[in-house]
Protein backbone atom coordinates (compact mmCIF):
# COMPACT_ATOMS: atom_id res chain seq x y z
CA UNK A 1 0.00 0.00 0.00
CA UNK A 2 1.38 3.36 -0.98
CA UNK A 3 0.93 6.11 1.53
CA UNK A 4 1.43 9.55 0.02
CA UNK A 5 2.38 12.27 2.45
CA UNK A 6 2.43 15.88 1.31
CA UNK A 7 5.82 16.85 -0.06
CA UNK A 8 5.76 20.18 1.73
CA UNK A 9 5.22 18.88 5.27
CA UNK A 10 8.36 20.67 6.37
CA UNK A 11 9.52 24.06 5.16
CA UNK A 12 13.15 25.03 4.81
CA UNK A 13 12.51 27.83 7.29
CA UNK A 14 11.21 25.42 9.97
CA UNK A 15 14.68 24.40 11.10
CA UNK A 16 16.63 27.61 10.45
CA UNK A 17 19.15 28.22 13.26
CA UNK A 18 17.67 25.26 15.12
CA UNK A 19 20.14 22.93 16.81
CA UNK A 20 17.57 21.23 19.04
CA UNK A 21 13.90 20.51 18.44
CA UNK A 22 11.35 19.44 21.04
CA UNK A 23 8.79 16.94 19.74
CA UNK A 24 5.62 16.58 21.84
CA UNK A 25 4.86 12.85 21.70
CA UNK A 26 2.06 11.27 23.72
CA UNK A 27 2.24 7.85 22.07
CA UNK A 28 -0.89 8.42 19.99
CA UNK A 29 -0.80 7.92 16.23
CA UNK A 30 -0.47 11.61 15.34
CA UNK A 31 2.50 12.44 17.54
CA UNK A 32 4.21 9.10 16.90
CA UNK A 33 4.00 9.70 13.15
CA UNK A 34 5.46 13.17 13.74
CA UNK A 35 8.44 11.62 15.52
CA UNK A 36 9.36 9.29 12.67
CA UNK A 37 8.63 11.83 9.94
CA UNK A 38 10.91 14.41 11.60
CA UNK A 39 13.56 11.75 12.26
CA UNK A 40 13.61 10.75 8.58
CA UNK A 41 13.55 14.37 7.41
CA UNK A 42 16.52 15.37 9.56
CA UNK A 43 18.63 12.64 7.96
CA UNK A 44 18.81 14.88 4.89
CA UNK A 45 20.55 17.66 6.86
CA UNK A 46 24.31 18.13 6.57
CA UNK A 47 24.41 19.51 10.11
CA UNK A 48 22.20 17.30 12.30
CA UNK A 49 19.49 18.81 14.49
CA UNK A 50 19.05 17.02 17.81
CA UNK A 51 15.61 15.59 18.59
CA UNK A 52 14.36 15.70 22.17
CA UNK A 53 11.05 13.91 22.68
CA UNK A 54 8.92 15.24 25.53
CA UNK A 55 5.89 13.37 26.85
CA UNK A 56 3.49 15.30 29.05
CA UNK A 57 1.89 13.11 31.71
CA UNK A 58 -1.24 15.04 32.66
CA UNK A 59 -1.93 12.52 35.46
CA UNK A 60 -5.63 12.57 34.61
CA UNK A 61 -5.84 8.81 33.94
CA UNK A 62 -4.28 5.82 35.71
CA UNK A 63 -2.77 4.61 32.45
CA UNK A 64 -0.92 7.84 31.69
CA UNK A 65 2.33 6.93 33.48
CA UNK A 66 2.58 3.59 31.64
CA UNK A 67 1.85 5.32 28.33
CA UNK A 68 4.66 7.80 28.95
CA UNK A 69 7.03 4.91 29.69
CA UNK A 70 6.05 3.19 26.45
CA UNK A 71 7.14 6.32 24.54
CA UNK A 72 10.40 6.24 26.50
CA UNK A 73 10.99 2.65 25.32
CA UNK A 74 10.44 3.64 21.69
CA UNK A 75 12.91 6.49 22.04
CA UNK A 76 15.52 4.26 23.69
CA UNK A 77 15.21 1.80 20.81
CA UNK A 78 15.95 4.61 18.35
CA UNK A 79 18.62 6.33 20.50
CA UNK A 80 16.53 9.49 20.93
CA UNK A 81 16.58 11.55 24.11
CA UNK A 82 13.27 11.36 25.98
CA UNK A 83 11.91 13.39 28.89
CA UNK A 84 8.69 12.95 30.86
CA UNK A 85 7.17 16.09 32.40
CA UNK A 86 4.16 15.94 34.70
CA UNK A 87 1.17 18.09 35.54
CA UNK A 88 1.49 18.13 39.30
CA UNK A 89 -1.02 19.36 41.86
CA UNK A 90 -4.77 19.63 42.09
CA UNK A 91 -6.70 19.56 38.81
CA UNK A 92 -9.59 21.93 38.04
CA UNK A 93 -13.12 20.53 38.11
CA UNK A 94 -14.22 22.54 35.08
CA UNK A 95 -12.64 23.55 31.75
CA UNK A 96 -10.26 20.62 32.05
CA UNK A 97 -9.47 20.49 28.32
CA UNK A 98 -8.44 24.15 28.03
CA UNK A 99 -6.56 24.00 31.34
CA UNK A 100 -4.66 20.91 30.21
CA UNK A 101 -3.72 22.65 26.97
CA UNK A 102 -2.30 25.65 28.82
CA UNK A 103 -0.36 23.47 31.24
CA UNK A 104 0.91 21.27 28.39
CA UNK A 105 2.35 24.19 26.44
CA UNK A 106 3.87 25.69 29.57
CA UNK A 107 5.57 22.40 30.44
CA UNK A 108 6.86 22.03 26.88
CA UNK A 109 8.17 25.60 26.98
CA UNK A 110 9.97 25.06 30.29
CA UNK A 111 11.63 21.93 28.94
CA UNK A 112 12.63 23.78 25.76
CA UNK A 113 14.23 26.49 27.91
CA UNK A 114 15.99 23.86 29.99
CA UNK A 115 17.32 22.02 26.92
CA UNK A 116 18.22 25.16 24.98
CA UNK A 117 15.75 24.32 22.20
CA UNK A 118 14.26 27.06 20.04
CA UNK A 119 11.57 24.96 18.36
CA UNK A 120 8.64 22.83 19.53
CA UNK A 121 6.65 20.66 17.13
CA UNK A 122 3.28 19.06 17.82
CA UNK A 123 1.26 16.47 15.90
CA UNK A 124 -1.96 18.37 15.18
CA UNK A 125 -3.59 16.97 12.03
CA UNK A 126 -6.18 17.90 9.44
CA UNK A 127 -8.74 16.08 11.60
CA UNK A 128 -8.02 18.49 14.46
CA UNK A 129 -8.32 21.42 12.08
CA UNK A 130 -11.64 20.25 10.63
CA UNK A 131 -13.09 19.58 14.09
CA UNK A 132 -11.99 23.02 15.29
CA UNK A 133 -13.63 24.64 12.27
CA UNK A 134 -16.89 22.81 12.89
CA UNK A 135 -16.91 23.71 16.58
CA UNK A 136 -16.29 27.38 15.87
CA UNK A 137 -18.92 27.42 13.14
CA UNK A 138 -21.51 26.20 15.60
CA UNK A 139 -20.52 28.81 18.19
CA UNK A 140 -20.39 31.61 15.64
CA UNK A 141 -23.84 30.72 14.35
CA UNK A 142 -25.21 31.25 17.85
CA UNK A 143 -23.38 34.58 18.05
CA UNK A 144 -24.74 35.58 14.64
CA UNK A 145 -28.29 34.91 15.80
CA UNK A 146 -27.73 37.12 18.86
CA UNK A 147 -26.14 39.82 16.69
CA UNK A 148 -29.10 39.94 14.31
CA UNK A 149 -31.58 40.09 17.17
CA UNK A 150 -29.70 42.91 18.93
CA UNK A 151 -29.31 44.82 15.68
CA UNK A 152 -33.06 44.65 15.14
CA UNK A 153 -33.74 45.81 18.71
CA UNK A 154 -31.29 48.72 18.41
CA UNK A 155 -32.84 49.88 15.14
CA UNK A 156 -36.31 49.52 16.60
CA UNK A 157 -35.30 51.61 19.61
CA UNK A 158 -33.65 54.24 17.40
CA UNK A 159 -30.16 53.81 18.83
CA UNK A 160 -28.65 54.75 15.46
CA UNK A 161 -29.56 54.77 11.82
CA UNK A 162 -30.34 51.47 10.13
CA UNK A 163 -27.75 52.04 7.41
CA UNK A 164 -24.91 53.03 9.74
CA UNK A 165 -25.60 50.30 12.29
CA UNK A 166 -25.97 47.53 9.73
CA UNK A 167 -22.94 48.67 7.74
CA UNK A 168 -20.53 48.83 10.69
CA UNK A 169 -21.90 45.68 12.32
CA UNK A 170 -21.65 43.65 9.14
CA UNK A 171 -18.05 44.71 8.49
CA UNK A 172 -16.93 44.29 12.09
CA UNK A 173 -18.64 40.96 12.58
CA UNK A 174 -17.06 39.73 9.36
CA UNK A 175 -13.63 40.66 10.72
CA UNK A 176 -14.07 38.58 13.86
CA UNK A 177 -15.85 35.81 11.98
CA UNK A 178 -12.97 35.22 9.59
CA UNK A 179 -10.42 35.39 12.41
CA UNK A 180 -12.07 32.52 14.24
CA UNK A 181 -12.49 30.30 11.21
CA UNK A 182 -8.80 30.38 10.33
CA UNK A 183 -8.59 27.87 13.21
CA UNK A 184 -5.22 26.39 14.24
CA UNK A 185 -2.21 28.30 12.84
CA UNK A 186 0.68 26.30 11.47
CA UNK A 187 3.16 28.45 13.38
CA UNK A 188 3.03 30.48 16.57
CA UNK A 189 5.46 32.02 19.05
CA UNK A 190 5.37 30.75 22.62
CA UNK A 191 6.27 33.24 25.36
CA UNK A 192 7.90 35.47 22.72
CA UNK A 193 10.82 33.07 22.61
CA UNK A 194 10.19 29.56 21.27
CA UNK A 195 8.62 28.75 17.90
CA UNK A 196 5.68 26.34 17.94
CA UNK A 197 5.11 24.57 14.61
CA UNK A 198 2.39 22.09 13.64
CA UNK A 199 3.64 20.56 10.36
CA UNK A 200 0.93 17.88 10.01
CA UNK A 201 -2.09 20.20 9.83
CA UNK A 202 -2.70 19.27 6.21
CA UNK A 203 -2.54 15.49 6.74
CA UNK A 204 -5.45 13.21 7.63
CA UNK A 205 -5.11 10.95 10.65
CA UNK A 206 -5.86 7.84 8.62
CA UNK A 207 -2.93 8.68 6.33
CA UNK A 208 -0.58 8.93 9.30
CA UNK A 209 -1.84 5.62 10.67
CA UNK A 210 -1.27 3.93 7.33
CA UNK A 211 2.25 5.37 7.37
CA UNK A 212 2.86 3.90 10.84
CA UNK A 213 1.52 0.49 9.79
CA UNK A 214 3.94 0.42 6.86
CA UNK A 215 6.76 1.07 9.32
CA UNK A 216 5.45 -1.64 11.63
CA UNK A 217 4.71 0.79 14.45
CA UNK A 218 1.82 0.63 16.92
CA UNK A 219 0.29 3.50 18.84
CA UNK A 220 -1.77 4.15 21.96
CA UNK A 221 -5.48 4.94 21.77
CA UNK A 222 -6.61 7.40 24.43
CA UNK A 223 -10.14 6.45 25.59
CA UNK A 224 -10.83 10.13 26.24
CA UNK A 225 -10.96 10.58 22.46
CA UNK A 226 -14.17 8.51 22.41
CA UNK A 227 -15.88 10.20 25.37
CA UNK A 228 -18.99 12.09 24.10
CA UNK A 229 -18.98 14.28 27.21
CA UNK A 230 -16.44 16.43 25.37
CA UNK A 231 -17.57 18.79 22.61
CA UNK A 232 -14.72 17.88 20.27
CA UNK A 233 -15.58 14.18 20.46
CA UNK A 234 -19.23 14.85 19.65
CA UNK A 235 -18.21 16.94 16.65
CA UNK A 236 -15.71 14.27 15.56
CA UNK A 237 -18.35 11.57 15.67
CA UNK A 238 -20.79 13.67 13.62
CA UNK A 239 -18.32 14.56 10.84
CA UNK A 240 -18.29 12.59 7.61
CA UNK A 241 -14.83 12.11 6.04
CA UNK A 242 -16.17 13.33 2.70
CA UNK A 243 -16.54 16.81 4.22
CA UNK A 244 -12.85 17.12 5.05
CA UNK A 245 -11.66 18.47 1.70
CA UNK A 246 -14.38 21.13 1.57
CA UNK A 247 -13.77 22.27 5.14
CA UNK A 248 -10.00 22.30 4.60
CA UNK A 249 -10.53 24.66 1.67
CA UNK A 250 -12.71 26.93 3.82
CA UNK A 251 -10.03 27.03 6.52
CA UNK A 252 -7.43 27.94 3.90
CA UNK A 253 -9.62 30.75 2.54
CA UNK A 254 -10.32 32.04 6.07
CA UNK A 255 -6.58 32.00 6.83
CA UNK A 256 -5.80 34.06 3.74
CA UNK A 257 -8.58 36.48 4.69
CA UNK A 258 -7.28 36.76 8.25
CA UNK A 259 -3.79 37.59 6.98
CA UNK A 260 -5.21 40.26 4.71
CA UNK A 261 -7.31 41.71 7.54
CA UNK A 262 -4.36 41.67 9.92
CA UNK A 263 -2.41 43.79 7.46
CA UNK A 264 -5.41 46.10 6.99
CA UNK A 265 -5.64 46.55 10.77
CA UNK A 266 -1.91 47.28 10.92
CA UNK A 267 -2.26 49.89 8.18
CA UNK A 268 -5.23 51.46 9.97
CA UNK A 269 -3.33 51.77 13.26
CA UNK A 270 -0.47 53.45 11.39
CA UNK A 271 -2.94 55.86 9.76
CA UNK A 272 -4.49 56.84 13.11
CA UNK A 273 -2.97 59.39 15.50
CA UNK A 274 -2.38 57.17 18.55
CA UNK A 275 -0.43 57.87 21.73
CA UNK A 276 0.05 55.79 24.88
CA UNK A 277 1.60 57.46 27.91
CA UNK A 278 1.36 57.16 31.69
CA UNK A 279 -1.51 54.68 31.69
CA UNK A 280 -3.61 56.51 29.12
CA UNK A 281 -4.15 55.79 25.44
CA UNK A 282 -5.54 58.48 23.16
CA UNK A 283 -6.75 58.17 19.57
CA UNK A 284 -7.27 61.59 18.03
CA UNK A 285 -10.60 61.92 16.26
CA UNK A 286 -10.06 60.32 12.85
CA UNK A 287 -11.38 61.59 9.56
CA UNK A 288 -14.70 60.09 8.53
CA UNK A 289 -13.36 57.50 6.09
CA UNK A 290 -11.15 56.02 8.83
CA UNK A 291 -14.10 55.92 11.23
CA UNK A 292 -16.00 53.92 8.61
CA UNK A 293 -13.08 51.53 8.11
CA UNK A 294 -14.21 47.93 8.71
CA UNK A 295 -11.38 47.45 11.18
CA UNK A 296 -11.97 50.58 13.29
CA UNK A 297 -14.15 48.95 15.99
CA UNK A 298 -11.67 46.08 16.11
CA UNK A 299 -8.79 48.53 16.69
CA UNK A 300 -10.74 50.32 19.42
CA UNK A 301 -11.44 46.94 21.00
CA UNK A 302 -7.76 46.04 20.75
CA UNK A 303 -6.65 49.11 22.69
CA UNK A 304 -9.45 48.63 25.22
CA UNK A 305 -8.24 45.09 25.94
CA UNK A 306 -4.58 46.10 26.09
CA UNK A 307 -5.20 49.07 28.39
CA UNK A 308 -7.51 46.97 30.56
CA UNK A 309 -5.07 44.09 30.99
CA UNK A 310 -7.32 41.55 29.27
CA UNK A 311 -5.99 38.18 28.15
CA UNK A 312 -8.39 37.70 25.23
CA UNK A 313 -9.57 39.83 22.33
CA UNK A 314 -13.19 40.91 22.38
CA UNK A 315 -15.70 38.20 21.46
CA UNK A 316 -18.30 38.96 18.82
CA UNK A 317 -21.01 39.98 21.30
CA UNK A 318 -18.80 42.56 23.02
CA UNK A 319 -17.52 43.84 19.70
CA UNK A 320 -21.15 44.33 18.72
CA UNK A 321 -21.74 46.29 21.95
CA UNK A 322 -18.76 48.47 21.11
CA UNK A 323 -20.07 49.05 17.58
CA UNK A 324 -23.42 50.26 18.89
CA UNK A 325 -21.73 52.74 21.24
CA UNK A 326 -19.24 54.03 18.70
CA UNK A 327 -21.97 54.83 16.20
CA UNK A 328 -23.58 57.37 18.53
CA UNK A 329 -22.57 60.63 16.86
CA UNK A 330 -22.84 62.83 19.91
CA UNK A 331 -20.86 66.01 20.53
CA UNK A 332 -21.24 65.46 24.27
CA UNK A 333 -18.54 63.71 26.27
CA UNK A 334 -19.48 60.06 26.71
CA UNK A 335 -17.89 57.47 28.94
CA UNK A 336 -18.40 53.71 29.23
CA UNK A 337 -16.41 50.67 30.35
CA UNK A 338 -15.39 47.68 28.28
CA UNK A 339 -12.84 44.89 28.73
CA UNK A 340 -11.48 46.42 31.94
CA UNK A 341 -11.01 49.84 30.34
CA UNK A 342 -12.77 53.15 30.66
CA UNK A 343 -13.44 54.53 27.17
CA UNK A 344 -14.15 58.24 26.92
CA UNK A 345 -15.20 59.87 23.66
CA UNK A 346 -15.44 63.58 23.00
CA UNK A 347 -14.91 66.05 20.18
CA UNK A 348 -11.17 65.51 20.13
CA UNK A 349 -11.12 61.71 20.06
CA UNK A 350 -11.12 58.55 22.17
CA UNK A 351 -9.27 58.04 25.45
CA UNK A 352 -8.71 54.71 27.24
CA UNK A 353 -7.40 53.83 30.67
CA UNK A 354 -7.65 50.95 33.12
CA UNK A 355 -10.83 51.12 35.17
CA UNK A 356 -10.27 51.14 38.93
CA UNK A 357 -12.24 47.97 39.66
CA UNK A 358 -10.61 44.62 40.44
CA UNK A 359 -7.03 45.89 40.57
CA UNK A 360 -5.42 43.65 43.16
CA UNK A 361 -2.24 43.94 45.16
CA UNK A 362 0.46 41.31 45.08
CA UNK A 363 3.88 40.38 46.39
CA UNK A 364 6.99 39.38 44.46
CA UNK A 365 9.45 37.25 46.36
CA UNK A 366 13.21 37.41 45.69
CA UNK A 367 14.16 35.63 42.48
CA UNK A 368 10.54 35.39 41.30
CA UNK A 369 8.66 36.85 38.33
CA UNK A 370 5.08 38.04 38.80
CA UNK A 371 2.43 39.12 36.30
CA UNK A 372 0.43 42.00 37.74
CA UNK A 373 -3.00 42.98 36.45
CA UNK A 374 -2.39 41.42 33.04
CA UNK A 375 -0.24 44.46 32.16
CA UNK A 376 3.10 44.37 33.94
CA UNK A 377 5.64 41.60 34.37
CA UNK A 378 7.85 42.21 37.41
CA UNK A 379 11.05 40.29 38.15
CA UNK A 380 12.52 40.78 41.63
CA UNK A 381 16.30 40.42 41.51
CA UNK A 382 16.74 41.79 45.01
CA UNK A 383 16.87 40.00 48.35
CA UNK A 384 13.61 41.35 49.82
CA UNK A 385 9.98 40.78 48.96
CA UNK A 386 8.34 43.76 47.26
CA UNK A 387 4.68 44.72 47.15
CA UNK A 388 3.00 45.65 43.88
CA UNK A 389 -0.28 47.47 43.33
CA UNK A 390 -1.91 50.49 41.74
CA UNK A 391 -0.46 53.94 42.37
CA UNK A 392 -2.15 55.72 45.27
CA UNK A 393 -3.54 59.23 44.91
CA UNK A 394 -1.54 60.62 47.84
CA UNK A 395 1.69 59.06 46.60
CA UNK A 396 1.07 60.50 43.14
CA UNK A 397 0.45 64.00 44.45
CA UNK A 398 3.55 63.83 46.63
CA UNK A 399 5.62 62.59 43.70
CA UNK A 400 4.32 65.35 41.43
CA UNK A 401 4.99 68.02 44.03
CA UNK A 402 8.54 66.85 44.78
CA UNK A 403 9.45 66.53 41.09
CA UNK A 404 7.76 69.72 39.85
CA UNK A 405 5.34 67.84 37.60
CA UNK A 406 2.30 69.59 36.12
CA UNK A 407 -0.40 68.89 38.71
CA UNK A 408 -3.00 71.06 37.01
CA UNK A 409 -3.16 69.03 33.79
CA UNK A 410 -2.53 65.61 35.31
CA UNK A 411 -5.09 62.92 34.49
CA UNK A 412 -5.27 61.15 37.84
CA UNK A 413 -7.77 58.39 36.89
CA UNK A 414 -5.23 56.94 34.45
CA UNK A 415 -2.21 57.73 36.63
CA UNK A 416 -3.82 55.72 39.43
CA UNK A 417 -3.72 52.65 37.21
CA UNK A 418 0.08 52.74 36.98
CA UNK A 419 2.20 50.17 38.76
CA UNK A 420 3.53 51.13 42.19
CA UNK A 421 6.13 49.03 43.99
CA UNK A 422 6.87 49.40 47.68
CA UNK A 423 8.57 47.91 50.71
CA UNK A 424 9.58 49.09 54.17
CA UNK A 425 12.02 51.59 52.65
CA UNK A 426 9.47 53.46 50.54
CA UNK A 427 7.58 53.35 47.29
CA UNK A 428 8.24 53.93 43.62
CA UNK A 429 6.11 54.51 40.51
CA UNK A 430 8.67 53.39 37.90
CA UNK A 431 7.02 54.91 34.83
CA UNK A 432 7.15 58.37 36.39
CA UNK A 433 10.58 58.41 38.02
CA UNK A 434 14.17 57.68 37.06
CA UNK A 435 15.18 56.44 40.49
CA UNK A 436 13.95 53.86 42.96
CA UNK A 437 13.16 54.87 46.52
CA UNK A 438 12.58 51.26 47.55
CA UNK A 439 16.18 50.39 46.56
CA UNK A 440 15.21 47.15 44.86
CA UNK A 441 16.88 45.43 41.93
CA UNK A 442 13.96 44.88 39.56
CA UNK A 443 12.98 44.42 35.94
CA UNK A 444 9.56 45.71 34.90
CA UNK A 445 8.09 45.08 31.48
CA UNK A 446 4.75 46.20 30.03
CA UNK A 447 3.16 43.28 28.21
CA UNK A 448 0.33 42.75 25.74
CA UNK A 449 -1.38 39.78 27.39
CA UNK A 450 -3.41 38.42 24.43
CA UNK A 451 -0.20 37.99 22.43
CA UNK A 452 2.45 37.53 25.11
CA UNK A 453 1.91 33.83 25.81
CA UNK A 454 0.98 32.53 22.36
CA UNK A 455 1.22 34.69 19.25
CA UNK A 456 -0.29 33.31 16.06
CA UNK A 457 1.76 33.98 12.93
CA UNK A 458 -1.41 35.39 11.36
CA UNK A 459 -1.51 38.28 13.87
CA UNK A 460 2.12 39.34 13.53
CA UNK A 461 1.47 42.31 11.18
CA UNK A 462 -0.64 44.33 13.62
CA UNK A 463 1.16 43.11 16.75
CA UNK A 464 4.41 44.48 15.30
CA UNK A 465 2.67 47.85 14.87
CA UNK A 466 1.24 47.76 18.41
CA UNK A 467 4.51 46.88 20.15
CA UNK A 468 6.12 50.35 20.10
CA UNK A 469 3.14 51.80 22.01
CA UNK A 470 3.71 49.33 24.86
CA UNK A 471 7.49 49.11 24.74
CA UNK A 472 7.97 50.00 28.38
CA UNK A 473 10.86 48.35 30.19
CA UNK A 474 12.39 49.50 33.46
CA UNK A 475 15.56 47.83 34.73
CA UNK A 476 17.20 48.91 37.96
Curated annotation (Swiss-Prot):
Residues binding ATP, per UniProt: 26-31
Entries under Gene3D superfamilies matching the protein: HUPs
Catalyzed reaction equations: cytidine(34) in tRNA(Ile2) + L-lysine + ATP = lysidine(34) in tRNA(Ile2) + AMP + diphosphate + H(+)
A molecular-function term among this protein's GO annotations: tRNA(Ile)-lysidine synthase activity
Entry's EC annotation: 6.3.4.19
GO cellular component, one term: cytoplasm
Pfam families attached to this UniProt entry: ATP_bind_3 (PF01171)
Entry's family note: Belongs to the tRNA(Ile)-lysidine synthase family.
PANTHER family: TRNA(ILE)-LYSIDINE SYNTHASE-RELATED (PTHR43033:SF1)
HAMAP family given in the database record: tRNA_Ile_lys_synt
Function: Ligates lysine onto the cytidine present at position 34 of the AUA codon-specific tRNA(Ile) that contains the anticodon CAU, in an ATP-dependent manner. Cytidine is converted to lysidine, thus changing the amino acid specificity of the tRNA from methionine to isoleucine.
Name of this chain's protein: tRNA(Ile)-lysidine synthase
Amino acid sequence: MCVKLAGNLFKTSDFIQCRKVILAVSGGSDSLALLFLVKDHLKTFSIPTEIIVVTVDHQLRRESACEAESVAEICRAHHIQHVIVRWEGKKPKTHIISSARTVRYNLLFKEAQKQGATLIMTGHTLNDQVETYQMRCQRLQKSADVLQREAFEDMRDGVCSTETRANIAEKSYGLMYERGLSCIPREALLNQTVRLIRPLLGVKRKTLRAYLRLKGKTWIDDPTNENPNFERVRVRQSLHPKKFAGIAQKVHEATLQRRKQAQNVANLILALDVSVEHGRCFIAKPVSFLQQHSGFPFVVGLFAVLMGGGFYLLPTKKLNTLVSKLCLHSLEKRRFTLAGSVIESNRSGLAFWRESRNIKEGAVEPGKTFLWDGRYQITNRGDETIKVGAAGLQQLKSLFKNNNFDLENAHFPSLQSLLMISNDKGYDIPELTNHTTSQQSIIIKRIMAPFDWLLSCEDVPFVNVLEPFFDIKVER
